[in-house]
Amino acid sequence: MVNDYKEAFAFYTQKLHFTLVEDTQLSPEKRWVIIAPPGGEACSLLLAKAATDEQRSRIGNQTGGRVFLFLHTDNFERDYKNLQDQQIKITRPPVTEPYGTVAVLEDLYGNLWDLIQPIKSF
């Protein structure tokens, strides 16, 4: 969930280089906004604007502080440098795990993402 379509769209497209897949006005207050990461033809993200106080209270903590979004890359160094260049908050620096190289980043609302370059054989 997002506070504002415009600010969320700007963050994901300008800082993470996502592209717009669909933007349909459903009502004066509601849009169907779908974005996708670079090379993410099989993956997309719906930007759903919080509509109630309860929903707004959960923005940025929809999973109780756990990582729940995973951004796969074929070039970890390039994409990690982009995160740094865009001044995106890194909450856990890169580490090499048995399954690949991973760092944890925070989006504009505090949601946690893994940037991960999986090991091909894993």
Which residues does each predicted region cover?
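Conserved beta-strand-loop-alpha-helix junction that forms the acyl-donor binding cleft
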Residues: V2-Y5, L26-P28
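Conserved active-site tyrosine of GNAT-family acetyltransferases
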Residues: A8-T13, L83, G110
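Helix N-cap motif at beta-to-alpha junctions
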Residues: Y5-K6, D74-E77
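Vicinal oxygen chelate
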Residues: T19-H72, Y80-L108, I116-F122
